[in-house]
Amino acid sequence: MPELNIAIDAMGGDNGPSIVIEALEKAVHRYPDVKFTVVGHEQQLTPLLDKFNLSSHPSINLVHAEQVIEMDDKPGQSLRSKPESSMRVALQSLTDGNCQAMVSGGNTGALMTNAYFTLKTLPGVLRPALMTALPNQTGGKSYLLDLGANASCDSETLFQFGVMGAVAAEYLSGVPAPKISLLNMGEEDIKGNDVVRNAAARLAQCEQLNYIGFIEGNHLFSGRADVVVCDGFVGNVALKSCEGLATFIIDQMRDTLNSHWLYRFFFRFLQKRTHKSWDRLKPDHYNGASLIGLRHVVIKSHGSASAGAFYSAIQQAVAEAHEQLPERIKHRVEAVLSEQL
């Protein structure tokens, strides 16, 4: 396998390039054999690279990009009016073969539009999907897709999401024969609309997939399924609801702990003994949604990500590039489609 080179859109996100460069400092030490192409405005990035002693680092190549896609830019407008944006230049490095993966914390709609235009989908893939990993009660991860790339989907698209998600679970988490479910309003076969029921029939008929039926939202974190499939509208609402609930619980715990010194004492006592469990639940560890179904690896970081969270997105990019995930998805989709002939 050729040496990995990861393109970093340093200008995307709400917190500016300083967060990206701070994350990059950690990444170059964690992955000494990986190269990083940092794309953005040279005058802004050079002082930051100097600050973190990365200016002359052999693993880093700085590429100037004159334009920046803002968080409020319309996707179509960004595609037409900003061909020299840091996001587009980073994506183009994949097409040119200079890099094997790209990470951006920029405008989600713009990233999806520019990635789709620049990279194209894999042969046979109808639509790309946004996918993320969720912690589950078994100690592993469950992969949820789509998270918003496609507000509505037909049954064949949902079927393909199941195929792609299974490849991700198999090669990124080492799960043999990943269990696939469709997110639905009930577990009975009669529940859901025609699109979901038809997708269920397609998944059940495919001998190469381990489809286990419908799953409800309250079992997303149970580990019952390794891959949970839904359209982008449902997936986005489900994910944002989970994030909102987590924030609410953390805020409530913080208010309670601050109300009395004794609560803080016992919390510190428990925290030392449950460190691994708490650490596994930190949202920063799960930052980085994969835009799968494209010809190259594209990772979307939260726009408001901390340096630690952006580092997790870089880790995701390295893992997918190392496993050559797009190529594996391509072969699996081809095999599944040939089975249907």
UniProtKB/Swiss-Prot annotation:
Homodimer. Probably interacts with PlsY. GO terms for molecular function: phosphate:acyl-[acyl carrier protein] acyltransferase activity. Pathway: Lipid metabolism; phospholipid metabolism. It is an enzyme of class 2 (transferase). Keywords: Cytoplasm, Lipid biosynthesis, Lipid metabolism, Phospholipid biosynthesis, Phospholipid metabolism, Transferase. One of its GO terms (cellular component) is cytoplasm. One of its GO terms (biological process) is phospholipid biosynthetic process. The keyword Protein transport does not apply. NCBIfam families: plsX. This is Phosphate acyltransferase. It is found in: Cytoplasm. Its main location: cytoplasm. InterPro entries: FA_synthesis, Phospholipid_synth_PlsX-like. Belongs to the PlsX family. It catalyses: a fatty acyl-[ACP] + phosphate = an acyl phosphate + holo-[ACP]. The keyword DNA damage does not apply. It comes from the Bacteria. Its EC number is 2.3.1.274. Catalyzes the reversible formation of acyl-phosphate (acyl-PO(4)) from acyl-[acyl-carrier-protein] (acyl-ACP). This enzyme utilizes acyl-ACP as fatty acyl donor, but not acyl-CoA. PANTHER family: FATTY ACID/PHOSPHOLIPID SYNTHESIS PROTEIN PLSX, PHOSPHATE ACYLTRANSFERASE.
